[in-house]
UniProtKB/Swiss-Prot annotation:
It comes from Brucella melitensis biotype 1 (strain ATCC 23456 / CCUG 17765 / NCTC 10094 / 16M). NCBIfam families: PRK10290.1 (NF007628). Disulfide bonds join 75-170. PANTHER family: SUPEROXIDE DISMUTASE CU-ZN -RELATED. Belongs to the Cu-Zn superoxide dismutase family. This is Superoxide dismutase [Cu-Zn]. Destroys radicals which are normally produced within the cells and which are toxic to biological systems. Residues 1-20 form the signal peptide. It comes from the Bacteria. One of its GO terms (molecular function) is superoxide dismutase activity. Its cofactor is Cu cation; Zn(2+). Homodimer. One of its GO terms (cellular component) is periplasmic space. Keywords: Antioxidant, Copper, Disulfide bond, Metal-binding, Oxidoreductase, Periplasm, Signal, Zinc.
Length: 174
């Protein structure tokens, strides 16, 4: 009897995998004065095949937008070449291997390169993208998420860092 109970209990536990860690990141407009209005959320969760980023955002222009994990846990503006740049305090793309290459989510460059987002005609994004090189949420805690104004070609040519342009929205990964 005891052996049957043990086997049954083990089977039940195996049927329900351990809950993976997840966190919700609030995304705010990146403005020269600092974070603006909330424009959506990104739920990051651990899953087989890499971290999953469930994006629900609005107020973007229709089309593709670069999406990255940035180095620092800040969305504050900063000064570059005498000009105030929104969310500059977030730093550059997360690149723990110091590759200095922007090769996309499948490449061997920045670990923070995520699949680009696609906003519909109403400027909304509701999709889940996977970062195959990022396995644990702990790898990116105390960093930031960034959505750029334009698309991303995952190359440093003809424009640096994929040509995504200005920083549109930013959120800190707690």
């Amino acid at each position: 009897m005891m052996k049957s109970l043990f086997i049954a209990s083990t089977m039940v536990l195996m049927a329900f995998p351990a809950f993976a860690e997840s966190t919700t990141v609030k995304m705010y407009e990146a403005l020269p004065t600092g974070p603006g209005k909330e424009v959506g959320t990104v739920v990051i969760s651990e899953a087989p095949g890499g971290l999953h980023f469930k994006v629900n955002m609005e107020k973007l222009t229709p089309g593709y937008h670069g999406f990255h994990v940035h180095e620092n846990p800040s969305c504050a503006p900063g000064e570059k070449d005498g000009k105030i740049v929104p969310a500059l305090a977030a730093g550059g793309h997360y690149d723990p291997g110091n590759t200095h290459h922007h090769l996309g989510p499948e490449g061997d460059g920045h670990m923070g390169d995520l699949p680009r987002l696609s906003a519909n005609a109403d400027g909304k994004v509701s999709e889940t993208v996977v970062a195959p090189h990022l396995k644990k949420l702990a790898e990116i805690k105390q960093r930031s998420l960034m959505v750029h104004v334009g698309g991303d070609n995952y190359s440093d040519k003809p424009e640096p860092l994929g040509g995504g342009g200005a920083r549109f929205a930013c959120g800190v990964i707690e």
